[in-house]
Structure formats: C-alpha cells, structure tokens
Amino acid sequence: MKAYNILLFCIMFCLSVSIHAQKQIVFVDEFESDIKVPQYVLTNIRAAVIDGIVNTNRVQVVDALTVAPNSEHSPMENALGYRAGYLLQGKLLNREATDDGFSGRKFHSRENSYKEKFVLRIQLIRTSDGTIICNRNYEETGSSGGKYASQYHALERALVNVPYEMRNFIEQYFRVHGSIVELVSDNGKKAKSVYINLGYDDPIKEGQRFDVMVQTSMAENYMEHKIGEVRIKEIVGPKYSLCKVMSKGAEDILKAIELGSKLHIVSSQSRLFDE
C-alpha cells in the first residue's frame, strides 16, 4: 500500500510538472546599451520590461541576473541550459535626458523640469533554431516638473507605458487557444455565460478576454471568422473557466452552439483584460 501511494505521488508529480510546463519559458538576458548611461537607467528599464511580461501570467520568465548563468556560455547556450524556448534580449539604442528648468525672478527660485526619452530594441529569438521572431524598437518619453522634480522621476514617468507595451508584445507572440465546451445560461436570444476548456493549468487570468471564432467553408477552403467575445469571470478548475459572453455577438454565439458548431477561442489582442 505504501509503495502504491509512493507510485501515485510520483505519477501526480510528473503530471503536475507537465502541466506547468505548458507555459513557454523565456530567458531574459542582461540588457546592453549602445550609449553610456547611468546603470540605474538600464536597470529600471529592464525591470519594467520583466514586470510587464510576468504580470501577463502567460510565460515563465528566467532572469539571467537572478540565476547567475555560466559566464563562459553564450546567451543562447544559457537559455537552452534552462530549457527556455525563447531568448529575449534588450539593447538601449538612444537616450535623451534634459533639464529644462529655469530660474524665477522672485527669491532666486528655480522651477525644475526634467525630460526623459529613450529607444529600446527588444529581440525575441526562438532557441530551437535561432530564428529571430521579433526585432522591434520601443520609444518612450516622460517628464517631471515642480519643486521636487528629478531626472529619476522623469524616467519613472517614461516607464509607465512599458507594462502595456509588454502585454501587447506577449499577446502577439504567445497567444492562448481553447474552445467553448458548454452553454451555461442564455435568455432565449443571446448566450449569457459559457464554460471554456482553459483553467488553472493554463496561462490565463480572470478578466481576460477571448475572441470567439467559428469555422466556415468556401469553395472547399476552411476559414475562421470572429463572431463575438467572452471574458473570464471565474477560473473554476484545472481545465475549466466560467466566462461571461459579451453582448456584441452573443446572439450569433447562441445560434452557433445550438447548431452544434465547434467554437474556437483565441486570446484577444484588441483588449486583453477588464481593469
């Protein structure tokens, strides 16, 4: 009996490992700079990029600065060493930090005004064959004014949009697919709620939106087109989530379900979450 329990534990552990392995692993290399900048600038930019990626819950991030990879190996070798499917590299191409403050006439006062502008190149490489999946530049700007303004605060303002950019980045290259498996409720004309076959085991979050796609055929060619959207209301199990059907397209979704059509869902790029 004891041996049976041990065997059962091992099986469940292996299943757990395989489940969590569904998330793609992204190895984030140390960022470089083509120009001389204070270290805090590169550190904060990189941290904002990583935070934005991690908060999507879409991929597993391995931070090169945290795991201390082998310095004798190339970034690609280190990424493969951590079984990462992708290598992400960043390079600061340009930075403009300006102090536009001016002195006032009264009491020799000074109005502080700082501006920050930088261009960062993000490169995503597939480790299996070295293919560059993405090579894109991001330009961000920010400013800080007033008595307590500083260049650091201007940089913080410039980083505000980075999480949103990274969310779109991850959504573009790591989309999630699933299906509607059951109609939960309707009002006779429109679908109100459904179950989808994605849950705790998948890289999803409550509030996340999905496009609902139905397959059609034309001249013996099959294609999919969007008929509506659903939003995750509650993740209820390893492979199930309760979703609210958004009003636009809810009638078409109900008709498709009643006809027995298979409805494919794919994470939406237009609006990922309700916030």
Question: Where in the sequence are the language-model features?
Answer:
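Positively charged n-region of N-terminal signal peptides that target proteins for export
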Residues: M1-I6
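Bacterial N-terminal signal peptides
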Residues: L7-S16
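A structural "domain/chain start" motif
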Residues: H20-Q60, E139, S144, Y173-S193, ...
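N-terminal segment of the mature soluble domain
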Residues: K23-K91, T131-N135, I204-Q208, M213-E220, ...
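Surface-exposed short loop/turn segments
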Residues: P75-I125, I235, R271
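Short secondary-structure boundary motifs at beta->alpha junctions and helix caps
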Residues: R110-V119, R126-N161, E220-S241, M246-D252
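Anionic-ligand-binding alpha/beta catalytic cores of soluble enzymes and soluble regulatory domains
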Residues: G145-S185
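Glycine- and charge-enriched low-complexity intrinsically disordered segments
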Residues: G237-E275
